[in-house]
């Protein structure tokens, strides 16, 4: 048996297109397309590439983007002032502050100033509270993308055994809560978990999200399981030539693909879904602000 590859790029393209369709409907009532504002502080190369991809996909879907760049020397007060200005701007529906921020800026304080109704990354305390309480709200993009891919692969997730490796507020914890919303049985594993390989072998759905290259080995995955690899790691690839690198996930793809039921590749799996869910959240935020909740359900 060879695993089915879950094509995150193709599914993300469907969501982008749907976001564009709904955004076009909203434009007539808003007088403009839904708008995403992205704040980038400093010159981190990976963040720069990611922001450019976000802006490109946003505009390709027919939505509007605003990109605000500040130097790494910008003060915390300056960044908070930008966030508050965007909060007050009726022409902005979603706000995203690209992380990581420079070390002298308190990320929690900056994120905490984002209007929860414009929090398209789903990271404010209000957004987290809505998720924990099961109330409607904007959900964190990467975890939401994981759940959507799992549903595309397996259908109804009710009763499925899910093991999430990692307990970060960005992926691990919200992913666990989102799978619980789908009536799955969820276990969160972490660095203190005893006998992690045995625990992983119980999973119908395995979600490694720790940033450790190929940590999950082939014999950690039971036959037929669905592996949603959130990790994206750059490692040396001497076979490609001196100084060359390649991207790998947190799961050892070549060891797993032969007996898993479903698996996301890296790249091309979870990554594209993160931006797709960001566009979806931007449109949802715009629909709710326009008092058209029916358009927020897609």
Curated annotation (Swiss-Prot):
A Pfam family annotated for this UniProt entry: THF_DHG_CYH_C
Alphabetical GO biological process terms: L-histidine biosynthetic process; methionine biosynthetic process; purine nucleotide biosynthetic process; tetrahydrofolate interconversion
InterPro entries from the UniProt entry: Aminoacid_DH-like_N_sf, NAD(P)-bd_dom_sf, THF_DH/CycHdrlase, THF_DH/CycHdrlase_cat_dom, THF_DH/CycHdrlase_CS, THF_DH/CycHdrlase_NAD-bd_dom
Pathway membership, UniProt: One-carbon metabolism; tetrahydrofolate interconversion
Keywords, comma-separated and alphabetical: Amino-acid biosynthesis, Histidine biosynthesis, Hydrolase, Methionine biosynthesis, Multifunctional enzyme, NADP, One-carbon metabolism, Oxidoreductase, Purine biosynthesis
Highest rank taxon of the organism: Bacteria
UniProt-annotated binding residues for NADP(+): 166-168, 191, 232
CDD domains from the UniProt entry: NAD_bind_m-THF_DH_Cyclohyd
Coiled-coil intervals: none
Keyword hit for NADP: yes
Reaction(s) catalysed by this chain's protein: (6R)-5,10-methylene-5,6,7,8-tetrahydrofolate + NADP(+) = (6R)-5,10-methenyltetrahydrofolate + NADPH; (6R)-5,10-methenyltetrahydrofolate + H2O = (6R)-10-formyltetrahydrofolate + H(+)
PROSITE patterns per the UniProt record, alphabetical: THF_DHG_CYH_1, THF_DHG_CYH_2
E.C. number(s) listed in UniProt: 1.5.1.5, 3.5.4.9
Single GO molecular function: methenyltetrahydrofolate cyclohydrolase activity
PANTHER family according to UniProt: C-1-TETRAHYDROFOLATE SYNTHASE, CYTOPLASMIC (PTHR48099:SF5), C-1-TETRAHYDROFOLATE SYNTHASE, CYTOPLASMIC-RELATED (PTHR48099)
Similarity remark: Belongs to the tetrahydrofolate dehydrogenase/cyclohydrolase family.
Subunit structure, as described in the record: Homodimer.
Protein purpose: Catalyzes the oxidation of 5,10-methylenetetrahydrofolate to 5,10-methenyltetrahydrofolate and then the hydrolysis of 5,10-methenyltetrahydrofolate to 10-formyltetrahydrofolate.
The protein, known as: Bifunctional protein FolD
